Structure formats: C-alpha cells, structure tokens
Amino acid sequence: MGKALGSWSGMRKYLEQDILADSLRGRIRYSCTSYVGMDGCRIFEVFVDAVQIKRFSWETVNTYFINSGYTTNPAPSGVGDYWAEFWPLLEKYPADQRTEYTDEEFCEALEAYRNQNIQESIRSDDPIVRMFAVLDRRIGKRTLQKLQESFDAQPDWVRQFYLLRINAETDGKQAE
C-alpha cells in the first residue's frame, strides 16, 4: 500500500467502517490480493452485497485493451504475447480515456481522496476518487440530489455506485 496509505487492513477498516455512509454499512467490501514475487502486483476489488462490481489490476487493464481492439494481436497466445503491447498502450491511453484501471491507479486515487476535502473528491476528474466520495458518509442527501444532474456524464461503472448510494438513502424512491 505504501507509507502514505498505511496497512491494507487499516485502509479497509477506514473505507468499510469509518467513512462509509451508514446506509451502506455491511454492503460494501474491499479486497486486496498481493502476489509474492510479482513486483508487488495487487488486485483490488470492490464488492456490493457480496458481488464483485469493480476490479483494479494490470491484468484487468490489459484484458480491456485486448477486448477493445487496441492491440494488434486480438488473440494473444502465451504470456509474452499477452503482455507485449501493455506498456505502450498504458502510456497511449491514460486513465481518463479508459474504464479499467491498474492497482497503482487505485492506490493513487485512494491517496488523493484521503488528502483532499470531500467536495474536491466528489468533483474530481478521477472516477475512482469520485467512487470513494459518493460512498462517503460526508456526502449528504442534498449533494446526492445535485449529483443526479451529472449522472449521465459518469462512466457506467461509476453510475452503479451513484445509484447504490442514492437508492440506499432514499429507499429506492427517487433514482431510476
């Protein structure tokens, strides 16, 4: 996780208990899997009601590149082929131009979220930061209502979290 963020268990407690909106307690779970011997690679996952909603890893991003047709080889065989175009594509398509993100981008977004006020986070250009913010207990019902105005501008995966929070706060009466 890095010194700025502390331990994963501490960060998970912060995200799932300390800062999570009361209406979502017990419904959101974060997971981190670290792979020994793979240069510190991790997979971060977000679960809602025990269903994985979002995954953050190099492999998730690379699979996105392949499935979206960004690679010259649409059917890589073997590890070398699979990863051959990853780094150039990662450089060519920064996070704001894709819908899948690496573990490092997850950590950077989490650090940004932790180190700025909630209003900056909810208006962030980074959709991962906005995900953390919309689940935050400091976002009230009036702010949630205002967020509905920008709902269509959100990536599909972020909309799921907006809807989840809005429905949790309103018992499903206002959101579509």
Label each PLM-derived region with a short phrase.
Residues M1-E176:
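Alpha-helical scaffold segments
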